[in-house]
Amino acid sequence: MAEARIDIFKKMINDDPNNTTIRFGLANELLKLERFEEAANELKVYLSQTDDQGNAYGKLAQTLERLGRVEEAREAYQQGIIAANRHGHPGMAQDFEMALDDLI
């Protein structure tokens, strides 16, 4: 069932590659299946296409952590802090700061 949803999202992205809502949905479906490398790639494309409020940076950072890419995760958290503060989400920024402190 989840694979079918991923196939549908991929077809929709193929038809409309600049639709950030669809791309974010695909990334979330990939995360559910623990397909972290693919999810990270989709999140990076998503972030290059839109002014995210911070949530996607957090998802990307956590995904990169799971992949053992700590420096990239650190950068994603830092970008997430900037985005969260810019969009008036100090609680999210604080969560990312704590996650940064916990990175090895």
Give the location of each predicted region.
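Structural marker of alpha-solenoid helical repeat scaffolds
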Residues: D15, Q49, A83-H87
